[in-house]
Amino acid sequence: MDLDQIVADAQQSFEQAADITTLENEKARFLGKSGALTELLKGLGKLDPEARKTEGARINVAKQQVEAALTARRQALADALLNQRLAAEAIDVTLPGRGAGAGSLHPVMRTWERVEQIFRSIGFDVADGPEIETDWYNFTSLNSPENHPARSMQDTFYVEGKDADGRQLLLRTHTSPMQVRYARMNRPPIKVIAPGRTYRVDSDATHSPMFNQVEGLWIDENISFADLKGVYTDFLKKFFERDDILVRFRPSYFPFTEPSAEIDMMFEHGKNAGKWLEISGSGQVHPTVIRNMGLDPERYIGFAFGSGLERLTMLRYGVQDLRLFFENDLRFLRQFA
């Protein structure tokens, strides 16, 4: 058979092969052990040396042309198969995308950070303390000695075991222990707030066994109730972002302050206009507490206040039931995102 005809037949056969299997079968017709080109190569031994050299060169050129056609068809079939697979896996970019769930701060944590930001802006430090506290720091150091009737004002979660000094452990009932802890590590003037979790045996629409509180303390040589009123009123106006806030101090009793006062506030406008809302406890730090801080009560004086972060959050956002903050209902929480 003429070499040119063999090459032409091979190229045509390869081009007509619809799949790899057919192509491999056609390859065997031309390049296999009994293929047309292979038979021609076997016959070279019958030729004289000069003719063998010339004919061998021609057969090799023809073989290269056939192999090139084979390679080209293999690539074409592979490309077609890939395109078919890609078409089956195609993504419709016109479909709306799936939105990723964006997280947000819990409303109480928003309040926590806002309180810190406001008090930092007026020169207060921020401190943190242990939630498992000793009864000495939680009660005794704050002028509530053992068997003092003030200890019955709140039910306490006591913890099994005692500290290294043999003192009873408990879940702190307020953040006030940080008054003494911080003052023992820092010298006056002391301006600090201590936000944190606290625990009491109480649960209803306005109380939770675990709640967040922020303690405020300012100790120096000439601090008065006027400073307390100025600081706290300024805080409320910044926190609620309004100037129509009236503040009053009602006489009260706390063992760690003397005199003591409940702080109430009232909006002049809006749905709560004309209503006095209890917001915080406060007072002038008791001399016994100042003494337990390691300071001289004849020289130093100051004020303290304690505010519930959930209470502030409820008033800011108009939430009526405290328990909603702890149920983790996304329908509720997304309102504050």
UniProtKB/Swiss-Prot annotation:
It is found in: Cytoplasm. Signal peptide: none annotated. GO terms for cellular component: cytoplasm. Its main location: cytoplasm. One of its GO terms (molecular function) is phenylalanine-tRNA ligase activity. Keywords: Aminoacyl-tRNA synthetase, ATP-binding, Cytoplasm, Ligase, Magnesium, Metal-binding, Nucleotide-binding, Protein biosynthesis. It catalyses: tRNA(Phe) + L-phenylalanine + ATP = L-phenylalanyl-tRNA(Phe) + AMP + diphosphate + H(+). CDD domains: PheRS_alpha_core. Gene3D superfamilies: Bira Bifunctional Protein, Domain 2. Binds 2 magnesium ions per tetramer. Pfam families: Phe_tRNA-synt_N, tRNA-synt_2d. GO terms for biological process: phenylalanyl-tRNA aminoacylation. Its EC number is 6.1.1.20. Its cofactor is Mg(2+). Mg(2+) binds at residue 258. It comes from the Bacteria. Belongs to the class-II aminoacyl-tRNA synthetase family. Phe-tRNA synthetase alpha subunit type 1 subfamily. Tetramer of two alpha and two beta subunits. This is Phenylalanine--tRNA ligase alpha subunit.
